[in-house]
From Swiss-Prot:
Pfam families: TrkH. Belongs to the TrkH potassium transport family. The lineage of its organism: Bacteria, Pseudomonadati, Pseudomonadota, Gammaproteobacteria, Enterobacterales. One of its GO terms (cellular component) is plasma membrane. It is found in: Cell inner membrane. GO terms for molecular function: potassium channel activity; potassium ion binding; potassium ion transmembrane transporter activity; potassium:chloride symporter activity. K(+) binds at T114, T115, L223, G224, D320, N321, N437, M438. Residues 319-324 are annotated as: Selectivity filter part 3. Residues 101-112, 113-118, 209, 210-221, 222-227, 238-253, 303-318, 319-324, 333-344, 345-357, 422-423, 424-434, 435-441, 454-465 dip into the membrane without crossing it. This is Trk system potassium uptake protein TrkG. Residues 33-38, 119-127, 206-208, 228-237, 325-332, 420-421, 442-453 are periplasmic. Signal peptide: none annotated. Residues 1-5, 61-68, 154-180 are cytoplasmic. Residues 222-227 are annotated as: Selectivity filter part 2.
Amino acid sequence: MNTSHVRVVTHMCGFLVWLYSLSMLPPMVVALFYKEKSLFVFFITFVIFFCIGGGAWYTTKKSGIQLRTRDGFIIIVMFWILFSVISAFPLWIDSELNLTFIDALFEGVSGITTTGATVIDDVSSLPRAYLYYRSQLNFIGGLGVIVLAVAVLPLLGIGGAKLYQSEMPGPFKDDKLTPRLADTSRTLWITYSLLGIACIVCYRLAGMPLFDAICHGISTVSLGGFSTHSESIGYFNNYLVELVAGSFSLLSAFNFTLWYIVISRKTIKPLIRDIELRFFLLIALGVIIVTSFQVWHIGMYDLHGSFIHSFFLASSMLTDNGLATQDYASWPTHTIVFLLLSSFFGGCIGSTCGGIKSLRFLILFKQSKHEINQLSHPRALLSVNVGGKIVTDRVMRSVWSFFFLYTLFTVFFILVLNGMGYDFLTSFATVAACINNMGLGFGATASSFGVLNDIAKCLMCIAMILGRLEIYPVIILFSGFFWRS
């Protein structure tokens, strides 16, 4: 990588750091309103990174070199690393929070990747500016995920949306958002914000206080899962709040391009036609029904309570939101394991959810069905069809290789944690929570991830970023072929 391209990457990263420093202004307003000392912490963070980012951006602006695909991969990974470090900075320098740098980094990575795992034991005791700040991290990270998945990664030839755009029927094929990245980002921002406002209003109507409604609204639509209370949604002990949280978890797992088309055209036909969405809703319904039956069968709740609690928690874990009821850790182990497995499914491509995504599972299901049919009729000329379109070998290879890498990293992280002395259930739940960007642990990490040692926390930070970027943009940087001229 020559000097000129280093300048290009530095220029872009400088601009992103400068832009992200502005995100410290809303928490400053909250701290000022509630007269909290954290105002100074956010101000210092703003000044430092405003100057660093602005300086890097300004001093490299005359590079005159065009961005290459290789530069794009580097910028994407640097985007999440830099944002994670900046997000951790105010949490680290505030002595009243008493967080080590590793703890602050874990919290920052968890927030900006919309994971929602926390190392803070008593979230409820945090100053309100930090409570808002954590939810804002989720919201900004969620927008970054959507823009990355829908607009950026397809330009680099990777990501689920590229697969969707080139081969699958649906919005990416026939209804491209806008021809320019900036316009696409703006369109997605408006759609995302409208859904967030709707969620806040519904929380407020369900009886949630305004501050809590704002924080939970923006963390719900981002599927981030940070809460203003240690008990999460369980703090409110309100069926309506759980219904709102579960409903918006599912709605936020829809492809955001679909939402844009629905809003702009004032028709729900795109939702009805989309085969990935139909498959996702079918799986979601199945998970909710199975979970409801399990908790009702053992007598934890009556039939009504079983459905409400299961609808909320199943929707939250399936979509990798991570909001929880207060007593979820007391649910039967087999039920929690079932929900942890469902978190690998995730939601639709082009949403804020984590996991492998429903379109990939749909293709794998169709491929498995195809193999069975081919074995039954060896001479028949059969093909894999999804929504009336033939799935090409290139797409099939892409799906299988992603599935293999995702499984490989999951098993690797589980074995490493288990080798550190954590029991298997804790290791599995912790890795599932992090690599799927779901955030809910079980076993030793049910209440907080602070029980992990520093090495384990760093590994889980890597898992969160790998899951958020869908693996390829990170591991490609370690390929010798990538760095050849």
